[in-house]
């Protein structure tokens, strides 16, 4: 088809002889030019006939510049046989050679003689209206020989046209409906000078206005009304060839082109078999090389027009290619990743080269492949695949030179490929800002609201997404430029109400190679200048200005899928991959990696394909690529496997424990602390390593410093983020840099973790003197071998075990503690004496030490003692489903304490943990409850009815009353040294409504000096009183709803809607509670008017009250 179009152009140029009369046809022009579209003497068949109205304006004394033949006295209807270059008719871009003129200014020419028609056209006046009939363009079918592609072209108007003629469009008769087809490109016009558009291309949109379903007249009107610069989306045909894909050696490719026209190929050098070779680096979209289908990126160029490239430099090869004539002969060695192709048209001849290469295993086979193209005048794009015969010299094991494919599947002309949303990467439908419901919603609301990561919206195909922004710097390419086209409002001068979209990305351009930009992304700013509230023309001008400096900085907004991410275990992720475009993930091998350990995803490029899935996170373990296991592969092998993947990459991932959304399942507490330094130091020392995924730990605090005074930061805490910049995958040096650059206000995201120190970690943190006697219990407890990291000594994220905290069988935390040996089971969870870890994390633990039957250094209990305690203390099992709810419950409560300013409670919790009370695993001794320590008052998950009794709390391991050891004295001493003087407790209370009074037996009031809701009055013997509530208790949660910032107006409805059961989390100042006890009892007429509510005594039993004995 390309050869045909070029022949047309040459013939037109050769026919620039001056006619004797501007409207007469010379005898030498009786024969239509070779290759002209449907020039016939007879009428056009009705099913192929289209019509249009052409309006021309001419000055007095000038001619239209067209030659008309035919008439009633001639051999056919009046038709246009020639258009003079530069004439009015030619520059109008509305007429084409072969069009039939039906009427002039309403005068029907059916019965006019030839000389009468000429006379009418001469004397018609300044305004000429022609009714024209033309042959509809042929149907372009995407089938076995042709595939469709799209490209965006930006053209500047010349006069009021772009230098091409369009035909087709929608019609009332479906058989006459066609896409809008470009049938002629005027030589020397804007489209011809730009060089991309060729006759036969389909025009899909103009400045984002889709032309599908528009009539010819409507399409012409849109072209006229657009601005002086317009962006056109063009669909073109690409020939595809089996002979290239199945070639076993060098091929000779002949491509026809106009002399002086560029082939559209950029070359580079590469090394193959220790020799420098010339290869195709880039192919411009819609260029001659792209349309022919025989050349691909990566092909080796062996010769150009017979000149060998073996000893040529890159500059010489480029010059040879530029000097080629109308027939380019290239000898190529196809790249091994050449895409599957079909047959090509007759202007591309492919045959086997005689050149034998030392690395070519089929060099001795003499096989030639000839492609015959049969041209159909009605369907010039359609190619038939000829039958091929193969020489007998080919052995049965040799690959065939060509694979014939005659797939019956094809697409009609009006089922454009651009409508297959999600199939083609350059889909027009998905890029239109008005093509989806999502875009319409974004246009109705303030667009800036979508910048919030917390606001999810519905994207294409109904997928839930959230938006993110990133900055991209592009460096222009000499051939393709930046390689992006924008799509904005209907008119170029219209102010944009939403940012322009990226509607097209050119293949192998800087925009595609960066791996970040995708079609449909919103361009928020260009070189720092916001695009919103500006015009589309201004946005395009910014891009054009950037091409002068060959560099542009884009701020883009894109969609990230809200994927369902497994919190543990393994799963598969499939990512689409393009040639020369990275997936956006960086893999690394930890220095402590052992044989069989997986590789780790150490970085994910923002905006990349991997990032947009919303599934992958830093630290995830990469187990396999395309079902190739990586446990025995080096990092270099894995990178090579990743680079060799085609089209779709399948990754097998194991989730990193730190990426789990349910941190509470491991007892982790994560909260944020804001420090205002006011020019002074923070007073913290951090330690870590340069390994990306080693934790950054607070190793020491300056005495009386800013961090220590907050009461929320402690030695051994892990820093997750600094000023919202995550430290995930970052070394110690980067964390130090972030702290140095943090400014006056520093926000730290802290994690109190229960994880034991990894065996592979090379560093241990020093611990304060007051805890130096606390050992790990993992190895010999001698002082020399004791690890020094504080988190090894105690799990600092375990909920507080004072009288306010629920029992261990209610906390639902899977804990493994001490030396590996005896395993204790309760509530469906294992208490192992190795370390504290979640069940999700066990699979990734390094091999544990051999079991040792030794005593715990601080407790003095052997495995036998643990067993004896287990036999008596773990008899009552509880529901494990409630356990998971409990762990979420406590973590939220602790976070509430931090965010509401009660950092003293956190200090109390820390001190309780450091005191060693975390070893109290709620073992119940065989003796009476009143003699044993309990950590919680409310056992609401028991299948029996609640019981009301009173107990006191003990900081020792469950045992009989006589078991007092040196450990207890040590713990008490540590409590005196460590614990904060702030008296505060944390309680969880479950109440059942009084069936008689229909309330919970207490009233609430707003705080006077501090924001919050507090217990005011308590009815004696009511559910609140029996449940242990006291005046001045602060309500942190009501039925798992955080109420730290609520007032009574919001809390009272929550309590009223709770039904018969009410779950509360309260904080208590024991001193205030003791004062309230001394106050006289309330009068007997205490009523519901004090906002009283809570639990039924009809459930019977004894609900325990807590006697706070541990004031901090």
From Swiss-Prot:
Membrane topology listed for this record: Peripheral membrane protein
Transmembrane segment boundaries: none
CC terms in the record's Gene Ontology section: dendrite; dendritic shaft; dendritic spine; dendritic spine head; dendritic spine neck; endoplasmic reticulum membrane; exocyst; GABA-ergic synapse
Compartment(s) where it occurs, according to its Swiss-Prot or TrEMBL record: Cytoplasmic vesicle; Perikaryon; Cell projection, Dendrite; Cytoplasm
UniProt keyword terms in alphabetical order: Cell membrane, Cell projection, Cytoplasm, Cytoplasmic vesicle, Endoplasmic reticulum, Membrane, Phosphoprotein, Postsynaptic cell membrane, Repeat, Synapse
PANTHER family membership: GLUTAMATE RECEPTOR-INTERACTING PROTEIN 1 (PTHR46227:SF3), GLUTAMATE RECEPTOR-INTERACTING PROTEIN GRIP (PTHR46227)
Protein name (database record): Glutamate receptor-interacting protein 1
Species: Rattus norvegicus (Rat)
